[in-house]
Amino acid sequence: MKIYKADFITSGVNPEHYPEPLLPEVALAGRSNVGKSSFINKLVQRKALARTSSKPGKTQTLNFFNINDEVMFVDVPGYGYAKVSKTEREAWGKMMEKYFTTREILKGVVLLVDIRHEPSADDVIMYDFLKYYDLSVIVVATKLDKIKRGQRDKQIAAIKRKLQFDGQDTFIPFSSETGEGVDAAWEAIYRHL
């Protein structure tokens, strides 16, 4: 896919902060440091459109990115970071729940999980939440380059089993280092628009 435009538009906490609903939206969710920003940057062929950090919990708002005037990516705060206060975690949870349940132009959610590990309890809760609200889900297993080729099928099966993966959803192994999975991710995203 040729990317001719990839712009950060705004950050928001409440609906009044969201941009006008002019483009279909695809949200990106996952644990802190699972690679959401790296995923965005690899898809749009930029090094720093979405800021990456080695420190978990950096994203604290909904961040909206206009891609080619065709789709809006919405990077949501990572979950599961223990050093964030309970009050802050609850506020993030309410912010994300409000977005996921009220944003009519939300066409799907990319749920990123680390292929090296079984999904956490938080990953399972997020997947179940998205399915409960009948949202289309693309599960992207990041950090594919960090495991041996012979381990891939085993890890994919373990992730699908733990999530109780719905066969109607899409599953994509992905590496922001090698670019493996980029084309499959774009195809899945465009199927949901």
Swiss-Prot record:
Q: Name one GO biological process term.
A: division septum assembly
The EngB-type G domain extends over: 22-193
User: What are the required cofactors?
Assistant: Mg(2+)
Annotated signal peptide: none
Say yes or no: keyword Lyase present.
no
Q: Where does Mg(2+) bind?
A: 37, 59
Residue sites binding GTP per the record = 30-37, 57-61, 75-78, 142-145, 174-176
Q: Report the GO molecular function annotations.
A: GTP binding; metal ion binding
What Pfam families has UniProt attached to this entry?
A: MMR_HSR1
**Entry keyword set:** Cell cycle, Cell division, GTP-binding, Magnesium, Metal-binding, Nucleotide-binding, Septation
What protein family does this chain belong to? Answer: Belongs to the TRAFAC class TrmE-Era-EngA-EngB-Septin-like GTPase superfamily. EngB GTPase family.
Give the function comment from the record. Answer: Necessary for normal cell division and for the maintenance of normal septation.
How is this protein named in the record?
Answer: Probable GTP-binding protein EngB
Q: Which organism is it from?
A: Exiguobacterium sibiricum (strain DSM 17290 / CCUG 55495 / CIP 109462 / JCM 13490 / 255-15)
Q: Which gene encodes it?
A: engB
